[in-house]
């Protein structure tokens, strides 16, 4: 009874870009050739399983006691990867179920929500498709999940992987604005007091126009100033500079329930940045050089109290 009451009072939400979680089998409908054993990255079964176990270890380490209740993962290829991650990797005893998109992204990457059935019961889910502009390639759908927590609260969760800045930030800005507009249109269909969480890799920092648009529309970026205990000042590091391109937004109705928001930068997720000094995420690949690491992004963690 005491444990149930304790679990009912708190909920841990994690967001993680998994850095190309591909299996090593070819999907004839997708451009996944470099993620095959004979491809440029020599993506063998041994490397695939190391990747899954690394991501499983990373997720488990985000909470000292128990496991995170909800985990938004982006940059995952397909259902096979999620099945192997939740049923056959180091994460197999955690009891996660999952929901994921089937997007038109040309490389085949998608987003997903891992959830603990004990503390989160999905009521319904849907995919929000992004109709691409004339100048952009097909991109990832937004995953929407409505579910009930152990405390009886209903959450509306949106998981995003916005288009990249490849081709230049200004040139691609409209692509990310399109995703923000699609998000807001969906949120505005919900009741005014709905408890909303929006998480993912937005490929923009908190001051970008698309993200300011979300803030100006009543959503609060609870991870805008998040840092880590080991020196991380962002979730991603490029040429010696930390960047926060992963974000977790909540509706006004949830703002008062946020007890803590931080970047999980456990020492084993970091490596020395020999070129620029300091530390950086211990990634799987540096260019095409295999490093046996975890991800080029660090996870965000938000702790809620209900």
Task: Give the ranges of each region predicted by the language model.
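Metal-dependent phosphoester-hydrolase catalytic domains
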Residues: 185-196, 203-306
